[in-house]
């Protein structure tokens, strides 16, 4: 009986107005819905990247690789933003692991070298570095030059044999990288930073202690074209956590450190990675980095 108060034209106008209001209301939510979709996708990616439930072990500590185990990936465009060097700039990208370049005994000698150097300083947080090239040594919340700060003690801390082994190992790592990626090793140059690292479970005191963040070496350092890690201690024996994690789009892929193990990879976005937080014990390693640009090359260290 109430509908008879309105004529048909009036009802049509009211219906159209109501429909327009509803359409406007839904359209106003579209940007919010799109934002929520993007945020959900980003959070899902982050969860998958950081969750151990979606992790594949590339190489376990218990395996012994007498030949490099190679995993090829498509090269990123990062290298296009830098000058190209034929025979060196990555055209074949990937990651590889081998246990046949450095012996366990040599790794133990290098670990003792690092222990002696780091005993003179050390970070207040969980991550300390020693760079034999620049002399940089973590001390408290800052860095000092070990060669200047401890000039009277250097001969008691390092020996020429230590440095000779360090140079020899660097050469062997450079050779296996060149062979694996089909490079001219004479066109590869050691670059900075190249350093020893010591990581334990102590909480971070400065940003320098926050080693666990995902990053891309080519983006972070610019000069890097190939990155290598020489592990000096054993995962699950000397420390817990601290695995090296390649963060691929569909899964995490980890390398479990083993004393004497060398892991190496092209340094671009194709190898986004992080290191798990060390939860107990102490993890020692050497980062040995290479560039194709001679202007960014550094010399082997020499004992002062």
Predicted regions and their residues:
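Fe(II)/2-oxoglutarate oxygenase catalytic core
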Residues: 2-262, 269-304
């Amino acid at each position: 009986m109430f509908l008879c108060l309105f004529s048909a034209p009036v009802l049509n106008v009211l219906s159209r107005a109501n429909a327009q209001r509803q359409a406007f209301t839904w359209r106003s939510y579209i940007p919010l819905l799109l934002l929520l979709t993007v945020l959900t996708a980003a959070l899902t990616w982050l969860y998958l990247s950081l969750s151990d439930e979606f992790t594949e072990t590339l190489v376990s500590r218990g395996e012994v690789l007498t030949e490099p185990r190679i995993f090829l990936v498509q090269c990123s465009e990062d290298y296009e933003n830098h000058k190209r060097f034929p025979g060196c700039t990555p055209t074949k990208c990937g990651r590889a692991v081998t246990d046949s370049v450095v012996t366990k005994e040599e790794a133990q000698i290098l670990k003792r070298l690092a222990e002696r150097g780091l005993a003179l300083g050390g970070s207040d947080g969980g991550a300390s570095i020693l760079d034999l090239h620049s002399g940089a040594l973590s001390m408290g919340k800052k860095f000092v030059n070990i060669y200047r700060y401890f000039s009277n003690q250097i001969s008691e801390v390092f020996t020429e044999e230590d440095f000779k082994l360090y140079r020899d190992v660097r050469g062997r790592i450079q050779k296996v990288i060149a062979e694996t990626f089909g490079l001219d090793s004479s066109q590869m140059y050691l670059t900075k930073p190249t350093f020893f690292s010591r990581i334990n479970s102590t909480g971070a005191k400065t940003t320098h202690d926050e080693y666990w963040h995902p990053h891309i070496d080519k983006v972070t350092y610019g000069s890097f074209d190939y990155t290598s890690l020489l592990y000096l201690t054993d995962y699950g024996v000397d420390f817990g956590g601290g695995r090296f994690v390649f963060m691929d789009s569909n899964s995490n892929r980890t390398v479990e450190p083993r004393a004497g193990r060398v892991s190496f990879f092209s340094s671009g976005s194709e190898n986004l990675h992080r290191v798990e937080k060390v939860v107990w014990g102490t993890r020692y390693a050497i980062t040995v980095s290479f560039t194709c640009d001679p202007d960014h090359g550094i010399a082997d260290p020499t004992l002062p």
